[in-house]
Amino acid sequence: MKKLGKAVLFCLILAVLLAFLNRILMPDTTFQADTEKIGDEVDYMVVGTSNVFYCVNPTVIWNEAGYTGYDLSLEQAPLIITYYQLKAELKKVKPETVFLDCAAFEYNYGIASMNQLALDKMPLSMDKLRLIKALGEDDKDHHIAEENKYSKINYLLPLHKFHDRWKEIFGGTLKSRYHEKYENTFAGYVATKDHFVYQNPHKWLPTMEEFGASFETNITDLNREYFEKIQALCAEHDVELILIKTPSKGWLLETHKNMKQFAEEEGLEFLDMNEETVIEALAIDEQVDFCDSSSHFNIYGTEKISRYLAEWMQTHQDYADKRVQGTGTNAYWNFLYADYLAFKNAED
Amino acid sequence: MTLVSVSFLIFLAAAVLVYYLTPQKGQWIVLLLASLVFYWLCSKGFLIFLLLFAGIIYVFARSFETGKKKLLVLLEVAILIVLLIVLKYAGWFGDGFVRFLSTISFQKPLSFVAPLGISYVLLTGIGYSVDVFRGTVTAEKNFLKVLSFLSFFPAITQGPINRFSDLSGQLMEGHRFSYEALVFGIQRMLWGFVKKLVIAGRLNVVMLELTGSWQGSKYSGAYVVLTVAICSLNIFMDFSGCMDIVIGAAEIFGIRLPENFDHPYLARSMPEFWRKWHITLGEWLRDYVMFSFTMSAPAKKMNKSLKGKVGRKTAAALVSIIGVLFVWLVFGLWHGISGTFLLAAAYYALLIIGGIVIEEPVKRFRSKYPQFTESKGFQIFRTVRTYFLGIPGAYLMLMPQVKSGLQFLATIFTRPAAQFVVKITEGEGAGTFLLGLDIYDFTVLILSLILWLVVTTLHRKKDVRIRLSNIHIVPRWAILLAVVIAVVLFGFYGDLNAGSFIYQGY
Amino acid sequence: MREKVLAILKEVNEEIPEYEGEGLLEDGIIASLDVIEIVSALEDEFGIVIAARNITKENFATVDSICALVESLQ
């Protein structure tokens, strides 16, 4: 019995040490909105992939229309992750509308290293375990990447993946808080002044032939399954679900048509910003507005897109202009916008 | 699930818990179930083939009780070997066959691999059959007991190759929980993790760097000698580390498995090296191949007729050379039907036969100059010589192709001075790289090799675990915690390809 | 009989009579090569047949165990 007590004590000490290591070695890539400060008066939420955090700037929408909302997104997030992220989020806040990024339909199980970022942010719960299980399960079409299969333990014990970051401690390069890329974030929006010129000279909404590469443009069974879960989740929380596609020169006409038909079948509104009328209204300058690809925008591009979205909300939704009413979180939103302006106007 | 995964640790813990909660009479059933579950988790539907092998082995062993034993034994061995070849080289039989096997195993065609450990089951099973045939053990009447012996899960992935007479009784008798066995078993496993994850993981990176991932290397000359040494050290750390994990895991259940390594690098001759390296395979080959041949009627007849003509010594040498050739042919083929393994086997066979040929002159030399040949210096010379004779074999085993592998070796002579000094180059991105490792990993490799040397030297005189248990609890726990944390931090795992063993492929 | 066995063993390998351990075969004092010579000589001397099943580390552990083996086969 005494020996057993000693063994338990030994394991406890070990567990504490490991938990400590886990804490210092797990990279913190937080760029999600601070829901504590935003409060529960939220008009909208934009969920999905990097196309969300590189396109929609909630502070600009606030400044334009007085609507509150934020981005909830992850690089290359598959719908599975979006679903569980949204599920957790809707327990905390109740937006009027959820805009679902259609780029998420391009992924199935996502990429393990990216998924890891979302999972590391989730406290242990049954939903987290369900998500981990879902990410490791093969569907009948074998969309799963090998690395995902083997990542369950990484998702569960981040130290398993990040243990070799001990080198960064010795090298003095351990960044415990932000990924460099996520240094300037505003309500889930990642601001950057980077600049990228897209070389392929085709028009917006190209056909597959014009684009010069072939893709799977149909919605996979897996994504349909998780889309339906998202739909049910929104219905349960009495939230309107809208499909959105931010501008991207890689978004094909075929995919657009499929998605449009899908939205009609599901009886959902579908805002595709790649349509000719929208593109004209946005007046995107292809020489100036992209940051690292034709679907990711720097602050100049995102301002155009966000302003357009604010106008669209004014004509299509009946959110209240909170600047007029004056609620408790106005100060925070004004601060966020000022903060963004300071970043924008700062000399590099 | 490999032996170095977190899932294996969880599985092992669960099995140990159930094992000791079960009355001793039923413990072997728990082990059998654990083995089957382990096999299922690793290989899914290939469990069928394990059962098939066990079934064949069981039925034949029973049949030896009556009838024409010799023919039956040959038939059994032939069936098992054909089955093994069909499974290991499914690709030869066309895509359709691979797809069929994939359906059985519930695995995608791309990730097709031969059933886990089936080569070890084959050796263990043939050993058991021959023992029954020779009458040294009696055939087990209960199929489940044979299955439990053949499938014992710690040993099924890479051995050691068990003997029925040594293991079966231990499996059946049941064991009372012993705190010491638990602690010692865990400590032995921990040491295996150090060797496999911390040392071999890094040696593997160095090996791949030096050989250009076997695709064509930018190194030459003296680096080739280094490569050969690294290859052999890598196999040793990988394989003996695995054995530490396997034997440690078995120890927790109160079961002692045979050792597979006994300081092979201290061997003073090639035969001694093979008594210290992959011991159970060496003994298997000696007992079931070598003696089967040399004690057979034709071999004895040959010996007798030669004796009159060339003398007793030479006759025995000639017969044993033929035996040696058989042994190494089996050795090469067992590792795989490929030129590289046959070449490695031929290399070892040549060394052993060379030893037989020069045995008499060496003996005469030794009795003539006893002071010299028994001096410490000469003994050290023998060890060093054996080491350098032995290590190229490991390289031959690891190289994927005969031609490119030998071309690389040839650069020792063709481009001897091309790169002699260890050069520190700037790698892509950050940090300085040394032989494929950054400065941190390189430091860890050197420090862990020193640690290995110290622990091994201490262990030769007295079991390190007993030494540990004799010191005060504070330094003891500090050491143990430090080693666990070192494995957690410095281990090579967590990646897709990490954690696979060299000897799992054979 | 023991003297005869000892003489055979000594002729094959001088180290055998001096060996004090309990694993002639296991420790490699008797190599596979020696086994052939020993078996052949014992068979001739005592008119017995030694089979593969008899070549175990237990039977070839010490000079005494070899004598016992010969005795059991006579």
Give each language-model segment a name:
Chain C
Residues M1-P17, A68-Q74:
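Thiotemplate assembly-line natural product biosynthesis machinery
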Residues I36:
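Conserved catalytic core of two-component sensor histidine kinases
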Residues V39:
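Short-chain dehydrogenase/reductase
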Residues I48-L73:
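C-terminal structural segments of small proteins and small subunits
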